[in-house]
Amino acid sequence: MVEKFIMAGDAALHVCDSEVGDKCVVLLHGYLENMLVWEDFVPLLYKDVRVVTLDIPGHGISVVNGEIHTMDYLADTIAAALDKIGVEHATIVGHSMGGYVALAFAERYAERLDGLVLLHSTPYADSDEKKKNRQREISLVKSGKKELLAHIAPEAGFAVENRNRFRTEIEDLQQTIYLTEDAGIVALLNGMIERKAQSEMLHALGKPILFILGRKDGYIVPEIADKMVAEHPEADVVWLENSGHMGFIEEPKTCAAALLDFVRG
């Protein structure tokens, strides 16, 4: 993987690119993560496809731009980044929040989309309760209590029975949160609060779609996951039987195989 720092529109972006492969897969990380979350997953892919990872603006070492990073703004930034590195078409894979960005990309740049993968993510807008929870997180960060997020969020991402086995990965994710700019966390929370529902867009997209879901996901509970699958017969679905919200870490080989099968068509 070749590390790059590029200007994508008005955003200074940190990118890694394997640079080789007829087909390209772009991996978009989730909230409170950065591109390093894919570090052990990428080697399962790059012998078969070109792989691009990046720090979404507001996380990692990509620059924060204002008090809100809307999903549309982030999608435009991704498109500009792909222009810079010479990628015309790609399969966009979005983990959790990255899935919301991927959906916005699909809506705005469908002609550049080979396929869309929602990895532990949904096309639904935030419920009122979820919006209130995000507002509480904003208040925590602004009051200097980010460590509370670090204490809770990473561990909650893993299935209960996997937490001891992935203790090192959980601690790495906690460290990532400590190193993430407060302003970036707030900008992305504001963007997620404002995002719209994308189910109708998915129905009309006319591109290959894959949902990868964890049976033991504490963030996307079974009722929501089942509802999403039932409402979107246009999507292929892969269930990770032993994963929570972090299937590319909890069941990496199964996750990678599903993704590569999808990309190959």
Residue ranges with predicted function:
Residues 1-25, 46-50, 83, 87-88, ...:
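Alpha/beta-hydrolase fold catalytic core
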Residues 94, 98, 102:
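Gly/Ala-rich beta-loop-alpha elbow adjacent to hydrolase catalytic centers
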Residues 11-67, 71:
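Conserved HGGG/HGGXW glycine-rich cap/lid loop of the alpha/beta-hydrolase fold
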Residues 243-252, 256:
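Catalytic histidine-centered segment of alpha/beta-hydrolase-like enzymes
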Residues 103-108, 113-148:
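Flexible "cap/lid" loop of the alpha/beta hydrolase fold
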Residues 73-90:
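Conserved acidic catalytic loop of the alpha/beta-hydrolase fold
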Residues 126-132, 144-204:
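Conserved alpha/beta-hydrolase catalytic His-Asp/Glu region
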Residues 205, 211-213, 217:
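Short beta-strand/loop motif that positions the catalytic acidic residue
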